[in-house]
Amino acid sequence: MSWGTELWDQFDSLDKHTQWGIDFLERYAKFVKERIEIEQNYAKQLRNLVKKYCPKRSSKDEEPRFTSCVAFFNILNELNDYAGQREVVAEEMAHRVYGELMRYAHDLKTERKMHLQEGRKAQQYLDMCWKQMDNSKKKFERECREAEKAQQSYERLDNDTNATKADVEKAKQQLNLRTHMADENKNEYAAQLQNFNGEQHKHFYVVIPQIYKQLQEMDERRTIKLSECYRGFADSERKVIPIISKCLEGMILAAKSVDERRDSQMVVDSFKSGFEPPGDFPFEDYSQHIYRTISDGTISASKQESGKMDAKTTVGKAKGKLWLFGKKPKPQSPPLTPTSLFTSSTPNGSQFLTFSIEPVHYCMNEIKTGKPRIPSFRSLKRGWSVKMGPALEDFSHLPPEQRRKKLQQRIDELNRELQKESDQKDALNKMKDVYEKNPQMGDPGSLQPKLAETMNNIDRLRMEIHKNEAWLSEVEGKTGGRGDRRHSSDINHLVTQGRESPEGSYTDDANQEVRGPPQQHGHHNEFDDEFEDDDPLPAIGHCKAIYPFDGHNEGTLAMKEGEVLYIIEEDKGDGWTRARRQNGEEGYVPTSYIDVTLEKNSKGS
């Protein structure tokens, strides 16, 4: 099968077909180009997505620690590598497929143009030979007709008796001339015809088949090139499949690395404050002052003793406690015992069972009208708030447990830096010894400035370590003391109630007097206690805010930098001081945020 023999007369068709082949090649090249743009945009969008969800971290504290977060960031890293492989696909297609197609299309256009020009030239040469043969043929035909006319004229004159001999001779000469010219044109025509037949045979059996064969080979090479580009298009994708598979395997491994128990433990390590939960509230017996005995002589005495006891045990307690519900405490009474409800004593000391309706009625009223005294645990999150203000050097703005961890981390970092400086000092000393033994290697004095700087760094780091260790010891000792103090309070069931700090810690002061309401006669009206206000505590000093404090949490007092407040209760060791504004608003503020000045007659109270 050859175009030269099968399609010898289809020059125009082959012209159109080869042009279509080049157009198809360029169309496929355009397709590859658009695919490359898609891959590039896809990779760019993936990288932007990774950059959006994996921002740069400014410090180590912001690095992800939870296994779910670490797994997500590992997935983002794998996705970033996956985006890189999409870029590799685009680059491979651009180099191996698109670039090769464009170069080959340019070469095809040049080669096709050359072959078509050769075919047209061969056709033009054959047409020229045909015209020469046709002209000689027409000239031979014309000379033959002229010779026939000359012969007819000669015969007519020769048969005419009236014609002169000269006319006959002239006609004969004219006939001979025309006959000679006809013979010459005949020979010319025969030569041109033979030449044309030869050129035509050469054209259709040699020249055109050769040109068409070259066009056929060109078109077949175009088809082969398309096949190679198809394969290269797929190979560009197949080459990155192993790496993409590794990226996907990395994502699967990241998913398997998620440990929910470890994350839960990290939550505990991150937010554990170190405080202990508040202890149980002691039972407050408000019914003992209304107990009566059968003897009339003991009624008034019991009232007086009860009144004295209540007045003594309740004096000033309202000042020392931040009431969670904003109400004045009910009168304090000795603990209620089962025998006090049902027994009475006679003057001679004998006891007998009795049933009093009044205490039961009072207890029922307490159950129906009394509000639950539940401490607020929202304040326990005081030390976890990220809005506390600027971080302090000793981390006193953090809860004890978090403060201990931060200090321990800083001590570990300082120890590592100290070890580096110590190693550098040892290296400098060794180098100095080498220089002293071999002066030609260097000047020992040149190492003295660096050695002095290293020693200064070591001293500075040791001081920092000592300072942080002192803070750490303070935190550990304070946490242990607070637990012992709360345990002692729970065992002794002190009637005095501890002050609740904003963190939820309690500070019990057994030496503080407790003030109760005035002695009332008749039935006790529980609604009076609901709406009475506490007397304001006296100021024991004043303070000035060093840092601003928002005071969003319950029981705290917001303050601005430079604001002056009254001190109404000192820091009991939990890092909080109770203060009051001039408008009477009270609350707790961080002790490390204020500059405290106490009155001389109030210090130590």
UniProtKB/Swiss-Prot annotation:
Region (Interaction with DAAM1, DIAPH1 and DIAPH2): 541-605
Comp. bias regions, Basic and acidic residues: 476-490
A matching Pfam family: FCH
Residue ranges, annotated region (Disordered): 476-539
Coiled coil: 66-258, 392-484
Region (Interaction with DNM2 and WASL) location: 541-597
Residue ranges, annotated region (Interaction with CDC42): 245-535
Topological type in the membrane: Peripheral membrane protein
Modified residues (Phosphoserine): S295, S488, S501, S505
Domain topic, free-text comment: The F-BAR domain binds the phospholipid membrane with its concave surface. The end-to-end polymerization of dimers of these domains provides a curved surface that fits best membranes with around 600 A diameter, and may drive tubulation.
Description of how the protein assembles with itself and partners: Homodimerizes, the dimers can polymerize end-to-end to form filamentous structures. Interacts with GTP-bound CDC42. Interacts with DAAM1, DIAPH1, DIAPH2, DNM1, DNM2 and WASL/N-WASP. Interacts with ATG3. Interacts (via SH3 domain) with ABI1, WASF2, CDC42 and WIPF1.
Protein name: Formin-binding protein 1-like
Organism: Homo sapiens (Human)
